[in-house]
């Protein structure tokens, strides 16, 4: 009994999954409840941030009144350079 208490919950969950597979029962992935909540929160936060980013870019686009072809080209190039820099730093 003491040995099982020393095993981290991740290993014990993997062990349980292997046992279930070998016995032919339906496998169920066991995760730590706080980890599941954390991942749900992360996904919600990231999707909200992505939506906000899209809304901001659309507002910027709509705020341009009678844009000339040159001003649009400059604007797009600036955005592309900024995006490229972020891509390389990450």
Swiss-Prot record:
InterPro entries listed in its UniProt record: Flu_proapoptotic_PB1-F2 (IPR021045)
Q: Name one GO cellular component term.
A: host cell mitochondrial inner membrane
According to the lineage, what is the superkingdom? Viruses
Keywords for this protein? Apoptosis, Host cytoplasm, Host membrane, Host mitochondrion, Host mitochondrion inner membrane, Host nucleus, Host-virus interaction, Inhibition of host innate immune response by virus, Inhibition of host MAVS by virus, Inhibition of host RLR pathway by virus, Membrane, Modulation of host cell apoptosis by virus, Viral immunoevasion
Q: Which GO terms describe its biological process?
A: symbiont-mediated perturbation of host apoptosis; symbiont-mediated suppression of host cytoplasmic pattern recognition receptor signaling pathway via inhibition of MAVS activity
List membrane-spanning regions: none
Q: Could you share any additional remarks the record makes about this protein?
A: Is not encoded in all strains, and seems to be dispensable for replication.
Return the similarity comment. Belongs to the influenza viruses PB1-F2 family.
Q: Would you tell me the protein name for this molecule? A: Protein PB1-F2
Q: Which organism is it from?
A: Influenza A virus (strain A/Turkey/Ireland/1378/1983 H5N8)
Instruction: Name the gene that codes for it.
Output: PB1
């Amino acid at each position: 009994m003491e040995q099982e208490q020393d095993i981290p919950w991740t290993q014990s969950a993997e062990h349980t999954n292997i046992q279930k597979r070998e016995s032919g029962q339906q496998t169920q992935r066991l995760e730590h409840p706080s980890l599941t909540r954390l991942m749900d929160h992360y996904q919600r936060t990231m999707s909200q941030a992505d939506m906000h980013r899209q809304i901001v870019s659309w507002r910027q686009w709509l705020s341009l009144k009678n844009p000339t072809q040159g001003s649009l080209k400059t604007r797009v190039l600036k955005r592309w350079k900024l995006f490229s820099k972020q891509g390389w730093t990450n």
